[in-house]
């Protein structure tokens, strides 16, 4: 369940900042709210919802990347046009998706112990978008690169509200 750390480290490396995945993961705040910190254990079972092992959303990841000197910004409701502008400028984008860019499903609402409600989905995952053409996006998913059709990507990305980390 450390895809967010893997994506963050790969993204940082693209901009010349060398980070350790284990160190990044260890420095993420812990919380039962994925909008505030990492929920559960990175060694937990996949496909669970909070308060079980789940992962973390964009804001804590961007904040930690910023701590390491990157001008990272978490965005929500980000448009595909804006994502393409980032890619065209040579800036890969970390995105939150459903599974391995599966067609989206209805998300769930989870209320954390502090009363904050977060949108969550089973098999929450992060990947890096590195390119696009008229038909597909190019994805870096750990050590694997692949492409998905734009409609399939948009369906998956919309599940968690078009959440991303961009270079600002």
State where each predicted segment sits:
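Noncatalytic regulatory segments and standalone regulatory/sensor domains
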Residues: 103, 108-121, 126-168
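Cysteine-nucleophile protease catalytic domains, especially the papain-like/related folds used
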Residues: 1-83, 88-91, 162-168
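A short, Trp-centered hydrophobic/proline-enriched beta-strand micro-motif
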Residues: 93-95
């Amino acid at each position: 369940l450390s895809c967010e750390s893997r994506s963050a480290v790969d993204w940082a490396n693209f901009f010349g900042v060398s980070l350790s995945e284990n160190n990044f993961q260890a420095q993420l705040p812990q919380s039962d709210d994925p909008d505030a910190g990492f929920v559960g254990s990175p060694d937990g079972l996949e496909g669970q919802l909070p308060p079980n092992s789940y992962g973390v959303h964009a804001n804590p990841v961007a904040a930690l990347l910023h701590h390491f000197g990157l001008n990272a910004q978490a965005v929500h409701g980000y448009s595909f046009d804006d994502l393409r502008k980032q890619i065209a400028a040579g800036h890969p984008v970390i995105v939150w998706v459903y599974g391995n860019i599966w067609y989206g499903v209805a998300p769930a609402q989870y209320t954390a112990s502090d009363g904050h409600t977060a949108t969550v989905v089973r098999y929450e995952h992060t990947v890096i978008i590195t390119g696009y053409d008229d038909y597909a996006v190019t994805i870096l998913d750990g050590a694997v690169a692949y492409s998905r059709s734009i409609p399939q990507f948009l369906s998956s990305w919309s599940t968690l509200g078009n959440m991303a980390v961009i270079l600002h």
